[in-house]
UniProtKB/Swiss-Prot annotation:
Disulfide bonds: none annotated. One of its GO terms (molecular function) is spermidine synthase activity. S-methyl-5'-thioadenosine binds at residues 36, 120, 147-148. Its main location: cytoplasm. It catalyses: S-adenosyl 3-(methylsulfanyl)propylamine + putrescine = S-methyl-5'-thioadenosine + spermidine + H(+). This is Polyamine aminopropyltransferase. It comes from Vibrio vulnificus (strain CMCP6). One of its GO terms (biological process) is spermidine biosynthetic process. It holds the Pfam family Spermine_synth.
Amino acid sequence: MSINPIVLLFALLCTLLSPFSIGQSTIIHEQKSLYQDIVVFEHQDFRCLSFTAKKGERVQTCEYQDPQDKRIYFPYVRMTLAGLLFNPKPERILIIGLGGGSVPSALAELYPESHMDIVEIDPVVSQIAERYFYFQPSHNTRVHTGDARVYIKRAGLKGQKYDFILLDAFNGEYIPEHLMTREFLMETKQLLSSSGVLVANTFSTSKLYDHESATYRSVFGEFYNFKIPQESGNRVILSMLTSLPNQQALQQQAEALASALQPFAIEIENYPSLMTLEADWDEQARLLTDQFSPANLLK
């Protein structure tokens, strides 16, 4: 007896998303793109997006079905807005990786006059974000379909600068190796404005950790390492061109931002105490470069 691959996918998906169960969830859309299989499903008051690529592993983003509910569901997604502690009034924003559009939507509401560029390699993801996750680009937002490395190189040649850069193109299934190298980070660094902040959503539990950390340190010098205990294994790297603010300054800024971020379920006043400048990696680890970047073997 043959097994319907969609049924099998759904069963595996629900197992990975415990406590969501197959009896309580409903697939509302599934589509194969050039890069991955994409599933949208609903569970109670959530709607979730799942990507499936080479090895059957998945990364999910979930949002509340009520379009008036602004809360960001996953803690690791909320963590990326810690970058606002370093630049609370970004006028130009660059986001690499769209997903369901939770972070761009939040930033667009917080800063309606700011210009935002979003780079997403998969056009199907952009379509699904708009159709199922209430992502509506404003007149100040442009979604660019293409490879982020190419976009950043071209932006650098044009002399473009950004106050807030978010690297969020990685997932548990596949890491774009060319977006982790020292050369790529140098190109990205050139796009930062004098007060700009780089935010990288990445992993804290992999063999890649030492190499990635050493590579970021080689390009940016000191950076804040932000982890939430007992969370998904994600971490957020935060750095700037200028000297980094101390813990006291971060806490003061968190208190100033707290009320604005409360509708998104971001308890930013708790974030500074979870950030550290201390190196907890092998500082002699080999740097990731365009010639050496075995990211998917090391994860």
